[in-house]
Amino acid sequence: MSETKRVRVRYAPSPTGFLHIGNARTALFNYLFARHNDGDFIIRIEDTDAKRNIADGEESQMTNLKWLGMDWDEGVDVPGKYGPYRQSERQSIYEPLIQQLLDEGLAYKCYCTEEELDAEREKQKANGEMPRYSGKCRHLTKEQQAEKEAQGFKPSIRFKVPANETITFNDMVKDDVSFESNGIGDFVIAKKDGIPTYNFAVAVDDHLMEISHVLRGDDHISNTPKQILIYNAFGWEPPIFGHMTLIVNESRRKLSKRDGSIIQFIEQYRDLGYLPEALFNFIAMLGWSPEGEEEIFSKEEFIKMFDPKRLSKSPALFDNVKLTWVNNQYVKKLPLNDVVELSLPHLQKAGVVSAELDQAELDWVHKLVSLYHEQMSYGAEIVPLSEMFFADAESITFDEEETAVLAEETVPTVISAFKKELEALEVLEAAEVKAAIKRVQKETGVKGKGLFMPIRIVTTGEMHGPELPLAIEVLGREKVLNRLDTWLKNN
């Protein structure tokens, strides 16, 4: 294909589920490639398998792509001259092309039943052979075909794969790739109901939409020789193909949608309060890397840098720890108001703040979130991070290490003195709390960890956390005094 041809790429999902991290990566790399080359990014919906399509599947794809920060030049919602952009609306385009292959003797009608095909495959497996269609309907006469149809058999249409050919293409990721035609077998291009199969519809659509490059996961690489054969049959020039390595989990196994231990759908990350810019950044580095060690880039920087030559030949590791780190880098840069907006729905969902906040409660939420602004990785994390602010004094328990600290003989004296200091304060602000702790130090003679750690553990229930005076201010006078009093009564 001529290198000067306008770059036109597509993301072509099936509306059979929600936007998966792997599909999002395919869309993102195509988007970056198009924008880097001032080309066109097209969304095409491959919805011919009606039984597998789900309600809202198409909407989920589009909504979440937009949320991630992608836009497109043509698609079901952006009309263009190459439409329709749903395969289910292109049947009138496919039918004459299928008939053309039949008329030219490049395809034929197959009357085999599923039972016959299953039996054929099982026999081949038992003989240690690669399962592929035997071609037994390939040489049926017109009379034999008519007899089959008179008996009520509906044919599928199979492509005649030429014998003894090597199908070779230069892949953007894998370099030269070859397949032997003898290992493919005549494949179905139209089902018994006349609906074209994936490989036929994709090849036709990519040609008619003038797709210049096909960048997709390498689970599609076995489809490529079939699509090239279809291109050749029509005398069309194939696009340039690129097959990205798959995404694997920490066990180096292919990321499976059935693995519930890993969050894999974009909608789930949205619901947890991840930032679209951070997910964009993380996904863009799944199997692609720029020069240098930097890992945080804007969308504009990714567009400027993107080069498919830097796509990895090794599987991309999905590292959830890395994702939360990336998201934290973005959260830290947000203004506090934005972090509050990110956190508030999760606090409300947990029932720890009101559904309708007055100004005083909203101000308090700002103080709470400010304690965790630097630490927070995503919106929903505010709930477990801040749970000690909502616990009742009676429900606070101490682990072995905390219990050991509180067993020191000076602790009751420190806690009593601190309680007395707080009771004398009219306003519980961080500066006043800090001064009160200093007075306790002077009064008791206890300092350092022996002073701060018992106060922290009794008031917050934790050995580590936000700066202690600030945490006590946010906890509030009543709650802190209640916790101090409860501990003293029980000890």
Swiss-Prot record:
* InterPro entries, alphabetized: aa-tRNA-synth_I_cd-bd, aa-tRNA-synth_I_codon-bd_sub2, aa-tRNA-synth_I_CS, aa_tRNA-synth_I_cd-bd_sf, Glu-tRNA-ligase_bac/mito, Glu/Gln-tRNA-synth, Glu/Gln-tRNA-synth_Ib_cat-dom, GluQ/Sye
Per UniProt, the short sequence motif 'KMSKS' region occupies residue numbers 254-258
This one is known as Glutamate--tRNA ligase
Requisite cofactors: Zn(2+)
Which GO MF terms are attached to this record?
ATP binding; glutamate-tRNA ligase activity; tRNA binding; zinc ion binding
User: What residues does ATP bind to?
Assistant: 257
Say which species the protein is native to. Answer: Listeria monocytogenes serotype 4b (strain F2365)
Similarity section? Belongs to the class-I aminoacyl-tRNA synthetase family. Glutamate--tRNA ligase type 1 subfamily.
Q: Tell me where in or outside the cell this protein is found.
A: Cytoplasm
